[in-house]
Amino acid sequence: MPHRCAAQVVAGYRSTVSLVLVEHPRPEIAQITLNRPERMNSMAFDVMVPLKEALAQVSYDNSVRVVVLTGAGRGFSPGADHKSAGVVPHVENLTRPTYALRSMELLDDVILMLRRLHQPVIAAVNGPAIGGGLCLALAADIRVASSSAYFRAAGINNGLTASELGLSYLLPRAIGSSRAFEIMLTGRDVSAEEAERIGLVSRQVPDEQLLDACYAIAARMAGFSRPGIELTKRTLWSGLDAASLEAHMQAEGLGQLFVRLLTANFEEAVAARAEQRAPVFTDDT
């Protein structure tokens, strides 16, 4: 699938090849591409380190309103690379148990950064999303799949657990507990068609339409209030963690009051409807 004009490239950790690309295909949209197509964009540390760096940079790029995350070539990501895991930084002189802890911490950080990113993240799942690749997709705010994509919680097939990188937390919240139990305990493939039906993805589209579909969603979100979008993302995620409806409603109310009282966005929306034009939100008084 072709990628658009590259405005910035984040170099790979070990290789001279750029294993993570940051591009700007449309105004206010950043596209982050896992660029290791010969390994289906597997999650080697040589990819995860620059991905973490790219996310940190994009989060504070005020020209970016929405992020699209995808993979180069035929795959989104098949998860761990068991043949070429890459190099974990800052592990000199550590014992194997501590080395393992640092490795898992790095992968966990990537998942959490997607959730904490200031901008909404759309996962453009262009092929297999397996194991850790499924976790990456679930950490995004919105998922759109190409027709050739499929999903698998692969740990159970490898004699391990299927629980990794937040999967046992994220998947039940996305599709319900019974379906999550069945998918994680059987390790079976979930097609793009089924993923759309059960709510694992928002929609599936023909392969050649995937990026344009994601850009269209991103462009719509980019037209709204920046703090409105950011606070809505925050409250959606905090709602998944909320201990009670009452506590969450208070957090929602404070966010709504913040934007209502500190900006003229609502007045602009009312005026725009009366004048039959698109609103222009300044996020200011």
Curated annotation (Swiss-Prot):
Transmembrane segments: none annotated. One of its GO terms (molecular function) is enoyl-CoA hydratase activity. Its EC number is 4.2.1.17. It is an enzyme of class 4 (lyase). CDD domains: crotonase-like (cd06558). It holds the Pfam family ECH_1. One of its GO terms (cellular component) is plasma membrane. It comes from the Bacteria. Keywords: Fatty acid metabolism, Lipid metabolism, Lyase. It catalyses: a (3S)-3-hydroxyacyl-CoA = a (2E)-enoyl-CoA + H2O; a 4-saturated-(3S)-3-hydroxyacyl-CoA = a (3E)-enoyl-CoA + H2O. GO terms for biological process: fatty acid beta-oxidation. Belongs to the enoyl-CoA hydratase/isomerase family. PANTHER family: ENOYL-COA HYDRATASE, IP11341P-RELATED. Could possibly oxidize fatty acids using specific components. This is Probable enoyl-CoA hydratase EchA12. It comes from Mycobacterium tuberculosis (strain ATCC 25618 / H37Rv). The lineage of its organism: Bacteria, Bacillati, Actinomycetota, Actinomycetes, Mycobacteriales. The gene is echA12.
